[in-house]
């Protein structure tokens, strides 16, 4: 990390002046707002002055529920300059008051002890409803467009140190109620310089990042805002809802701005492969793209290979594909596949995998797992059994990590901290194995389905079911329930009501043929019935709870 600033604020102050480098924000109307670094820096200091005028002091938290990317980034940086601790929060899929969403806001803001929350005019009504809830009745709610206007009051910037909290990243809640991950400036700088430095993506002066990822989530926030500021990498940011409506715009922006680095979860590569037409292909040029990263959810080899094949016509280089592994507790990524080399796919015997051993196989029925690469320099991984003892090569166990990117616990949550952080190691809760130095992720330990003594990974079942015509791919959950003293498999999938009977039969038959499992129940649900986290991950445990209490809506 020699030569890099030691805090986010120091990095912001060190960025070059002039018009050539900065952040470009794409609006919902497709208009572009360009902020050179100097303008970002000036507006951050201006907003810092407004925030401290509210009586906020260094170390205080401030909630950010901003659907507008430029408002989010400017306010986050303003809070950082003021020594405050931003708390990024999902701004909601719609701007309507719903009990569940407002309850989530209340929980996060109350847990973070935030006295102030900044939003935008379009979601002001929703966020203001917090004042009617017990945990946040005294909170101050301000719309950025209305608050940061006029001449800024006097302001003296506090000294920011590497040990200071940079922000609180509340976990997605895919496995539990959200917890506040404490990211210090030293964690952020260590991770950013690792994944963007020579041992990671190998940032060059000519790089341009292009992203549609949500900024309340670590991949978008650190990967394309905070990390890029620390290493001076210009970016183009488009709104997440715009990607959902027009996936091809992601690739159009890469083409227009000669993007070199982008990142997305598995589902996004699948979506553009399916939705971009042959006519669209003729207008795209992806030859500039040297990094097409993938992470944040299970990675499917077939998805990435199909993407590479389809977009080879646009100059896409398959060696740009870069699978990775990480979690909020390690800031962002902690392992990368080696850039510029072909993706590695491990084909293993499914029967042996159910016994917890990844035995190579050439059989057509072999499971395909994608290598997530090796840890960054200065970081370590371990794979251990239930007793905490290291396991051998190709033996499945829990993945542990440690290093300067890894944080030191959850905000005012000693119980959760003690459970996940032991003897300097972060216990991820993820199952995986190592082969030839590479890490392969199998799934979450708590989601493992054990039937007749055999281990089954829910995402394997979900992927197979998602390939059935009529099932909404990416909208399938598999979980186990106890019945008569044994674990039984339940599958819930979103699909068409008219196909309900056929889909149930086809799903049960395919799962039996592929895994030797007979589902106790197959539920076919309407679109949107299955719960997801704010980052789009399936909530298996919540789905299970809803199913067990007869709350999971099914087609008749």
Feature map (PLM): residue ranges:
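Conserved AMP-binding/adenylate-forming
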Residues: 290-292, 299-438, 446-448
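AMP-binding/adenylate-forming catalytic core of the ANL superfamily
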Residues: 255, 262, 403, 408-409, ...
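ANL superfamily adenylate-forming
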Residues: 29, 97-98, 102, 106, ...
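Conserved AMP-binding/adenylation subdomain of ANL enzymes
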Residues: 189-208, 218-260, 275-280, 339
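Conserved C-terminal "lid"/linker of ANL adenylate-forming enzymes
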Residues: 475-479, 490-491, 508-556
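Conserved AMP-binding/adenylate-forming core of the ANL superfamily
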Residues: 23-74, 94-101, 157-160, 183-189
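Conserved adenylate-forming
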Residues: 51-56, 155-163, 168-213, 231, ...
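AMP-dependent adenylate-forming
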Residues: 10-36, 166-168, 175, 326, ...
């Amino acid at each position: 990390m020699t030569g890099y600033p030691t805090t986010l604020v120091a990095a912001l102050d060190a960025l070059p002046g002039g018009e050539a480098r900065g952040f470009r924000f794409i609006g919902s109307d497709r208009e572009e707002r360009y902020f050179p670094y100097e303008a970002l820096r000036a507006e951050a200091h201006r907003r810092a002055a407004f925030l401290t005028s509210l009586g906020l002091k260094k170390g205080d938290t401030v909630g950010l529920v901003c659907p507008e990317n430029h408002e989010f980034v400017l306010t986050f940086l303003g809070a950082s300059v003021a020594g405050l601790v931003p708390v990024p929060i999902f701004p909601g899929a719609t701007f309507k008051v719903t009990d569940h969403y407002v309850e989530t806001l209340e929980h996060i803001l109350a847990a973070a002890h935030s006295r102030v929350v900044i939003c935008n005019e379009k979601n002001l009504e929703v966020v203001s409803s917090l004042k009617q809830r017990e945990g946040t009745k005294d909170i101050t709610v301000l719309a950025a467009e209305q608050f940061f206007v006029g001449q800024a009051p006097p302001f003296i910037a506090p000294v920011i140190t590497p040990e200071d909290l940079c922000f609180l990243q509340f976990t997605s809640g895919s496995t539990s109620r959200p917890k506040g991950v404490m990211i210090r400036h030293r964690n952020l700088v260590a991770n950013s310089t690792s994944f963007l430095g020579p041992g990671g993506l190998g940032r060059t002066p000519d790089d341009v990042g292009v992203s549609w990822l949500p900024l309340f989530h670590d991949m978008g926030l650190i990967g394309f805002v905070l990390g890029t500021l620390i290493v001076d990498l210009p970016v183009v940011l488009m709104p997440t809802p715009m990607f959902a409506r027009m996936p091809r715009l992601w690739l159009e922006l890469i083409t227009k701005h000669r993007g070199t680095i982008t990142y997305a979860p598995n589902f996004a590569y699948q979506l553009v492969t399916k939705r971009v037409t042959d006519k669209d292909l003729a207008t795209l040029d992806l030859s500039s793209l040297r990094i097409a990263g993938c992470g944040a959810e299970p990675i499917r080899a077939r998805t990435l290979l199909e993407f590479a094949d389809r977009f080879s016509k646009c100059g896409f280089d398959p060696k740009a594909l870069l699978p990775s592994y990480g979690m909020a507790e390690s800031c962002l990524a902690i392992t990368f596949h080696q850039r510029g080399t072909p993706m590695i796919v491990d084909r293993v015997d499914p029967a042996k995998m159910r016994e917890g051993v990844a035995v190579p196989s050439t059989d057509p029925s072999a499971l395909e797992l994608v290598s997530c690469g090796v840890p960054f320099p200065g970081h370590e991984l371990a794979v251990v059994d239930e007793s905490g003892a290291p396991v051998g090569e190709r033996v499945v166990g829990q993945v542990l990590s440690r290093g300067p990117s890894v944080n030191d616990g959850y905000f005012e949550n000693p119980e959760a901290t003690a459970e996940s952080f032991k003897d300097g190691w972060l216990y991820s809760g993820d199952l995986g194995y190592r082969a030839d130095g590479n890490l392969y992720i199998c799934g979450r330990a708590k989601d493992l389905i054990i039937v007749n003594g055999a281990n089954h990974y829910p995402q394997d079942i979900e992927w197979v079911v998602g390939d059935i015509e009529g099932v909404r791919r990416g909208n399938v959950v598999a979980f186990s329930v106890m019945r008569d003293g044994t674990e039984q498999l339940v599958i819930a999938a979103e699909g068409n009501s008219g196909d309900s009977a056929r889909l149930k039969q086809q799903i049960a038959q395919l799962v039996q043929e592929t895994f030797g499992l007979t589902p106790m129940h197959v539920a076919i649900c309407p679109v949107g019935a299955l719960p997801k986290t704010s980052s789009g991950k399936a909530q298996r445990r919540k789905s299970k709870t809803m199913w067990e209490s007869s709350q999971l809506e099914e087609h008749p």
